[in-house]
Amino acid sequence: MPSVKVKENEPVDIAIRRFKRACEKAGVLSDVRKREFYEKPTQERKRKKAAAVKRYKKKLQRESIRTTRMY
C-alpha cells in the first residue's frame, strides 16, 4: 500500500494528488478491479491466452509494417 508523508505547510489537496499518483503507479486500482469478482481458473487461463495472442498479432503487424516501407 502506497504511503505519502504530508510535508509541513503543504495543502491537503496536493498530498491527496500525490497519494493518488502513488496508488496509480503501484497498480492498486487495477488490482482491486481484477479481484472484484471471482474468476474461475479456466476463465483466467482463457483470458491470459487471448491477451497473449493479441500481443503476438500486434507484434507481427508492427514487424510487417517495418519491412514494407520503401521510403
From Swiss-Prot:
One GO CC annotation = ribosome
Residue ranges of region Disordered?
A: 48-71
Q: What is this protein called?
A: Small ribosomal subunit protein bS21
Q: Establish whether keyword Iron is in the entry.
A: no
Annotated Basic and acidic residues bias: 61-71
**In its UniProt record, which GO terms are filed under biological process?**
translation
Family statement drawn from the similarity comment of this UniProt entry: Belongs to the bacterial ribosomal protein bS21 family.
Q: Where is the composition biased (Basic residues)?
A: 48-60
Q: Does the keyword Heme apply?
A: no
UniProt GO molecular function: structural constituent of ribosome
Cross-referenced NCBIfam families, in alphabetical order?
Answer: S21p
Q: Which Pfam families match?
A: Ribosomal_S21
Q: Which UniProt keywords apply?
A: Ribonucleoprotein, Ribosomal protein
